[in-house]
A protein has these predicted regions:
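Conserved beta/loop motifs at nucleotide-recognition and modification sites
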Residues: 1-168
Length: 168
C-alpha cells in the first residue's frame, strides 16, 4: 500500500507512521523497515528497495522522509538531474503487495503540489492522510500521557529516562 502523510507536527507524523507500520508488520526490525531521506536518495533507489523481497518476513515498510519533489516550491537539489520520476510513478501505479511505501511530508497540506503526477498517482492508488493542527480541547488529549509521565517522575525520580542531568 502507498501512503502519503502530511502535517506540520513531526511527532504526530511519526506516530501515524508507526501506527501504520505496526498494523502491517507487527514487529519492526532493521530488515523489514527501511528509511530514506529523499533529499539525498534517488527515487530509483527507493523503488529498488521497495521491489526487494522482504527477507524472512511477509511484509516490509519503506519510509521516504522529506520528499521535496511533492512540494509546490521544490528546493534546489544536487541529485535532481539524476532523478527518474517516471520509475516512481510506474511503481506507485503497480505497487508490490509485500511492501508499504510511506511518504512523510513535514509541511501543511496546502504546500503539496496536488497537480503533480506523483501526487495524483498516490491519490489514485494509495491513501493520502493530512494531519491537521489539534484544536484547543484536542491538545489536552494529546498532552495527557506526556503530563502523566511528568507526574510519575516527580513521585519517583528513578523512573526518569536516562538523559543527561545537570550536575551541581
Amino acid at each position: 500500500m502507498i501512503y502519503l502523510i502530511s502535517g506540520k507536527q513531526n511527532i504526530r507524523l511519526k506516530s501515524q507512521m508507526k501506527n501504520i507500520v505496526k498494523k502491517s508488520l507487527g514487529e519492526i526490525d532493521a530488515i523489514n523497515f527501511v528509511k530514506h531521506d529523499a533529499s539525498y536518495t534517488l527515487v530509483q533507489e527507493i523503488v529498488d528497495e521497495a521491489n526487494y523481497l522482504p527477507l524472512g518476513y511477509d511484509h516490509k515498510a519503506v519510509i521516504v522522509d522529506n520528499p521535496y519533489f511533492l512540494l509546490k516550491e521544490k528546493s534546489k537539489n544536487k541529485i535532481e538531474s539524476d532523478q527518474n520520476y517516471q520509475e516512481l510513478i510506474d511503481y506507485i501505479n503497480h505497487p508490490d503487495e509485500s511492501c508499504d511505501l510511506i511518504f512523510l511530508v513535514n509541511t501543511s497540506d496546502s504546500d503539496i503540489d496536488k497537480k503533480s503526477e506523483i501526487y495524483q498517482a498516490i491519490e489514485a492508488n494509495g491513501q493520502v492522510i493530512a494531519l491537521t493542527e489539534p484544536k484547543e480541547n484536542e491538545w489536552i488529549k494529546c498532552s495527557r500521557p506526556w503530563s502523566l509521565n511528568i507526574i510519575a517522575w516527580k513521585k519517583k525520580p528513578s523512573a526518569m529516562p536516562a538523559w543527561p542531568r545537570r550536575r551541581r
